[in-house]
Swiss-Prot record:
This is Secreted RxLR effector protein 90. Secreted effector that completely suppresses the host cell death induced by cell death-inducing proteins. The keyword Cell membrane does not apply. The gene is RXLR90. The keyword Magnesium does not apply. The RxLR-dEER motif acts to carry the protein into the host cell cytoplasm through binding to cell surface phosphatidylinositol-3-phosphate. Its main location: secreted. GO terms for cellular component: extracellular region; host cell plasma membrane; membrane. Belongs to the RxLR effector family. Residues 1-19 form the signal peptide.
């Protein structure tokens, strides 16, 4: 009996001592705190992971709610009304405006009959500031009035310009006189290569046959002078002379030795009359 009581007392004391040593040992206390910390860290990690997943889900939901802008088609050609004269032809419908009416009638697919409006059919013609329609100008012609009346004259016909001549005397113009055409003579004098007229050998100018007393083979008047038998081809006062016709050389004189025979009126030189003129 005594031995059993002693054994129980010994066992109780040994258990008490062992418990006290475990609590007082720092190593054992560290193991216990480490186990507690691990459990705490694992729980916190799980919480962080859970919170992260919840945040990602919220961001995804927000992105899905963002509206994406869609480009809107804009027409490239915007129709603009243009005001112009009544004879304007439209580029799309080839609309033509007549002079008798003031309405543009389209000849395309949108054209309709008179008095009926259709899509693109009738467009009002441009008007003035007071509301009146713009008048269509009447057709004009550049033909002279004499051609229209079948009565044509030389003065109303167009003339062809004559090219400038390279040779000749001191003439007032280069090729021809006051008229249009070119004379076949000319060595100097009043004009360079022509007459005072407008035809081949003079014309309707100052004389009929020749120049104005200054060309090589020309003179002042016609080929018919005052004195018929006295003129010759080198000058004189006669048929081919100066006052009436001046001859084919100078202004006056006679024969080869006249005052202007091959003389001062032209470019060949002058002399003094040695012969008496025959009457």
């Amino acid at each position: 009996m005594k031995s059993a009581a002693a054994f129980a007392t010994f066992l109780t004391l040994s258990v008490f001592v062992a418990t006290t040593e475990v609590q007082g040992t720092p190593g054992l206390r560290g193991l216990r705190s480490l186990a507690d910390n691990q459990s705490t860290e694992s729980s916190e990690g799980r919480k962080d992971h859970y919170n992260h997943h919840r945040h990602v889900k919220k961001v995804i939901k927000k992105v899905k709610k963002i509206a994406i802008p869609v480009p809107v088609a804009v027409p490239q050609y915007i129709p603009v009304p243009i005001s112009g004269p009544s004879s304007v032809i439209a580029s799309q419908n080839t609309a033509v405006v007549g002079s008798s009416n003031n309405v543009v009638a389209a000849s395309g697919a949108g054209a309709v009959g008179s008095g009926v409006l259709g899509p693109g059919g009738v467009t009002p013609a441009p008007t003035t500031m007071t509301g009146r329609p713009v008048a269509t100008p009447a057709p004009t012609t550049s033909v002279p009035s004499s051609l229209v009346n079948t009565d044509t004259s030389d003065n109303q016909l167009p003339t062809t310009p004559v090219a400038a001549s390279q040779g000749g005397g001191i003439g007032s113009n280069l090729a021809g006189g006051s008229g249009n055409s070119v004379s076949m003579s000319g060595f100097g004098g009043g004009n360079q290569m022509g007459t005072f007229g407008n035809s081949m050998f003079g014309g309707r100018g100052a004389n009929t046959g020749n120049g104005f007393n200054g060309n090589g083979n020309n003179s002042f008047g016609q080929q018919m002078g005052i004195d018929t038998p006295n003129g010759n081809m080198f000058g004189g006062f006669g048929r081919q002379g100066a006052a009436g016709g001046g001859g084919q050389r100078g202004f006056g004189g006679e024969a080869p030795d006249g005052i202007n025979s091959v003389a001062s009126g032209n470019a060949l030189g002058g002399g003094i009359t040695r012969r008496r003129r025959r009457l």
